[in-house]
Amino acid sequence: IAAFYQCSFIQAIELTRDANESIGSSSISLRKHAVDSSIPSDPPPLVTEAQHFLYNLPPLHQAGFEGQGIRIGVADGGFYNADSLPALPQEHWLGYADFTDEKNDIFGTKGKHGAMCLTAIMAKSDSYQGAATKADYFLFRTEEPDTESPKEIDNWVAAIEMADSLGLHIVSTSLGYTTFDTEVFNFSYADMNGRNSRGAQAAIIAARKGLLLIVAAGNDGNKTWHYISTPADADSILTVGAVDIFGEIAGFSSFGPSADGRVKPEVCAVGFQTVLVDPSNGKLINSNGTSFACPLVAGMAACLWSALPNATNMEIRERIIRSADRY
């Protein structure tokens, strides 16, 4: 914490809870507990460069590669107010689909988690630079607002199928599953092998078809279940953990390896005090969660793919993995 006070762009730090205090129940999804805190702030212009600098994104932006020609899907819960937020220019919207029981209410009052993730990658204003502001976006609502059931995995699989049909390049997924309202459906760590869940199976098929899937690792690193969730366990995708702007791992970031011994997460990005746009009022905030690290990597992948338009999804994935400081 002391190191943060030395940063000129941080005006104040306020601890919202004791470090040992439990946050929520592990039985809820990543969507519901991805945000550990939301602390209003007023960062100086382009403070987002600090979180982009960690993986050397500014040179791509400076070279003119900001996601042009890349189509990105964002699969999540609600996208509250995203359709009227000035920082999210609608000229880069391809459309949206709602796979939940509520149908076509993705911009309604139930849930802003998806909108917050979207701002990390898409938003642009005088004081904010998303990771890939010139890419085009399609939104998928797959999370039921009031229940936790395997149906949500089926919703996500349907969204990935649509993403393939639409010719998208990348899908950013800030959700994950381990336990459900009905315990008989719960996963064990042994299930996190990239083969057992329908979500992991669909992710592998999508990768074979050319999609690059970016998935949040989960926020259970400091809980009894401290492993990744699914579909983050899938092979041939990029699972993203959370660090601070200095590269130090966030305590809540879920651990690997997968149950069959593969390295997970493959990469990390800034998910501690990530600068975002609050969809409720358009102000800048700082929030925590691998949910917010995930779209940053998706945006970086889009910019890299803009620079290397003939690359395959697996080539982009491999370049990103090789860029990691612990590769």
Which residues make up each language-model segment?
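Solvent-exposed, polar/charged alpha-helical surfaces in well-ordered, non-transmembrane soluble domains
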Residues: 2, 6, 58, 115-119, ...
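Solvent-exposed loop/turn segments at secondary-structure junctions
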Residues: 1, 19-21, 77-81, 99, ...
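Hydrolase catalytic cores
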Residues: 140-144, 227, 271-327
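Subtilisin-like serine protease catalytic core
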Residues: 59-152, 166-169, 182, 208-210, ...
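Autoinhibitory propeptides
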Residues: 1-52, 58-61, 235
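Catalytic-core environment of secreted peptidases
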Residues: 86-94, 245-292
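Sec-exported extracytoplasmic/periplasmic mature domains
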Residues: 5-9, 122-126, 161-168, 204-208, ...
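Substrate-binding/access-modulating region of protease and related hydrolase catalytic domains
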Residues: 61, 124, 139-233, 259-262, ...
